């Protein structure tokens, strides 16, 4: 079993092969700038790979990236999804950029921030993202507004349908085909095939092994009755079927990573493509993670430590390279722009550091630093040796990566130094507070604006379909006093086509609903009735209690409504209720007409 503090076994890899590879690939590197492919797993722990010693799972394709390139010994991300994605995209701590959470608008990356895609786009690259965005749904938070020429996937932080899912392509609704990770990979490969003659960035942020627990049958059959040898640190908290499903999803993810790597090789691109792989936070359930404490949502090692694998065969990253200084998601933007030899777009100072001297074995002095983590009011600082938590605990991660012993009392000077640094960092970060940013509507360059239930507020007896706002819908609309509101800011005065994604029991059809914004009010009749059953065949295991069970929503063509420029509440209410309920509401779409 591998201990998370050591990668000694990896050092035995045949480094001599690297000289031959570099010689063979030198010509290719000189011909054009490198392509960049970035894989991000969702809720995968450090221990979810055969490379890190997990004998429960087999991940040869992901492992091959590590074996052919560099491995970061201690790489840190955030406790939750959206903050990590924001830090990767910008090279800056998420708290600086408006990212305060994972839903209800808290996930949005401030519009004055520049992303990695902005930099590569400005340098002449074609840029594409395929998967879970999770940094804003409306323009100018949308990926097409953040430097990506092509986008296919979903912008929410959680998705409730993993088979034939409703997705979007560049802001327009589409229907995916098959299992979602396979479908996202299909589109990423098509993008690579279409643009292989010029430099490209392909960002593939998967949404697995994040729940719901749904995986193709052939993968589940591998794990359904498989003994789980390596267990969570606290086996009593581990739900073995959830571990099996998460690992089945990991093997599917590995299959899809392998598909991309194979296509790069077939197109003659693998040698001059920088390939990056990491995860956005720790595992979503207690399962084997090298003995580390904590899971997703924690600032402990298990919550924020991820693998980081980087490969560039033609660029000087030698197989067997191990990055021993602590690293973080904030380092990837400066590193990738440096490796590609392009300038960074944007003037705001970076928090991350360029790792290319470590990757390329340059004799550049490396100054030790601290890396900081935040989850709500809990914060933590990490040095090359220690973890200091805002509660006052200190752990020696070199001798005790499992955090089994608090050594604060034995190291008062270290505690003082790290507490002071953490306090200064916290004072520098904006405070966590209620997000007061409205949802922008009606940008002329992106006329369709989705307003999902996630971004609205229910009033009266209306409630969400489950506790987690992401991928929820409004239910229990029974009273004339009930309403739903969205805080919007209309950018362009004009006529808007209004669509409502709804379901309604057939006997309840006929209610009259009203939509109001400032001085504009329009009404419509809820018809026809449409009451599909909840999907029963998508899930491999029961959903966690906070996740909504999904169904097929239809579009109610509400009509056209004139919206004046300005900020206000978009309010949906009923003027007449024809039956027991009005309808369930998943989303309102507002499309600016010419």
Give names to the regions the model predicted.
Residues 1-10:
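N-terminal secretory signal peptides that target proteins for export/translocation
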Residues 11-24:
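Bacterial N-terminal signal peptides
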Residues 25-390, 401-427, 432-434, 472-473:
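Formylglycine-dependent sulfatase
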Residues 339, 415, 419-594:
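Extracytoplasmic
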């Amino acid at each position: 079993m591998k201990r998370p503090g050591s990668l000694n076994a990896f050092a035995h890899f045949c480094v001599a092969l690297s000289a031959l590879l570099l010689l063979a690939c030198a010509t290719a590197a000189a011909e054009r700038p490198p392509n960049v492919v970035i894989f991000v797993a969702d809720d995968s722990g450090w221990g979810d790979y055969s490379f890190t010693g997990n004998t429960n799972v087999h991940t040869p394709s992901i492992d091959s990236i590590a074996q052919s390139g560099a491995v970061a010994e201690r790489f840190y991300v955030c406790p939750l999804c959206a903050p990590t994605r924001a830090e990767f995209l910008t090279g800056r701590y998420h708290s600086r950029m408006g990212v305060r959470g994972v839903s209800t608008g808290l996930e949005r990356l401030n519009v004055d921030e520049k992303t990695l895609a902005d930099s590569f786009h400005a340098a002449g690259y074609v840029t594409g993202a395929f998967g879970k965005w999770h940094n804003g749904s409306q323009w100018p938070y949308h990926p097409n507004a953040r430097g990506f020429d092509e986008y296919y996937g979903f912008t929410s932080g959680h998705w409730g349908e993993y088979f034939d899912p409703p997705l979007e392509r560049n802001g327009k609704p589409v229907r995916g085909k098959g299992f979602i990770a396979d479908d996202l990979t299909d589109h990423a490969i098509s993008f690579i095939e279409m643009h292989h003659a010029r430099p490209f960035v392909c960002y593939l942020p998967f949404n697995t092994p994040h729940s719901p627990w749904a995986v193709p049958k052939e993968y589940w059959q591998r794990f359904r009755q498989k003994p789980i040898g390596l267990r969570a640190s606290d086996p009593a908290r581990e739900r073995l079927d959830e571990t099996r499903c998460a690992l089945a999803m990991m093997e599917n993810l590995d299959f899809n990573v392998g598909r991309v790597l194979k296509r790069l090789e077939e197109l003659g691109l693998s040698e001059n493509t920088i390939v990056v792989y990491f995860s956005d936070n720790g595992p979503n359930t207690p399962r084997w993670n090298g003995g580390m404490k904590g899971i997703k949502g924690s600032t402990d090692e298990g919550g924020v430590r991820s693998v980081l694998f980087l490969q560039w065969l033609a660029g000087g990253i030698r197989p067997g390279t191990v990055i021993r200084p602590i690293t973080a998601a904030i380092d990837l933007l400066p590193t990738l722009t440096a490796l590609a030899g392009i300038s960074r777009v944007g003037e705001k100072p970076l928090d991350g550091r360029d790792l290319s001297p470590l990757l390329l074995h340059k004799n550049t002095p490396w100054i030790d630093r601290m890396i900081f983590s935040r989850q709500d009011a809990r914060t933590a600082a990490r040095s090359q040796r220690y973890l200091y938590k805002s509660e006052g605990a200190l752990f020696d991660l070199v001798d005790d990566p499992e955090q089994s012993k608090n050594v604060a009392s034995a190291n008062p000077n270290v505690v003082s130094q790290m507490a002071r640094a953490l306090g200064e960092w916290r004072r520098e970060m904006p405070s966590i507070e209620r997000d007061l940013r409205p949802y922008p509507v009606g940008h002329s360059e992106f006329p369709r604006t989705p307003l999902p239930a996630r971004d609205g507020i229910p009033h009266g007896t209306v409630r969400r379909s489950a506790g987690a706002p992401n991928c929820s819908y409004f239910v229990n609309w029974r009273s004339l006093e009930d309403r739903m509101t969205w805080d919007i800011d209309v950018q362009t005065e004009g006529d808007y086509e209004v669509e409502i994604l709804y379901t309604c029991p057939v006997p309840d059809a006929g209610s009259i609903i009203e939509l109001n914004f400032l001085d504009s009010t329009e009404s419509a009749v809820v018809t026809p009735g449409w009451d599909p059953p909840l999907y029963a065949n998508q899930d491999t295991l029961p959903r966690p209690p906070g996740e909504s069970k999904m169904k097929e929503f239809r579009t109610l063509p509400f009509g056209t409504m004139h919206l004046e420029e300005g900020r206000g509440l978009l309010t949906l209410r009923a003027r007449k209720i024809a039956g027991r309920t009005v309808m369930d509401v998943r989303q309102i779409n507002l499309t600016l007409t010419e």
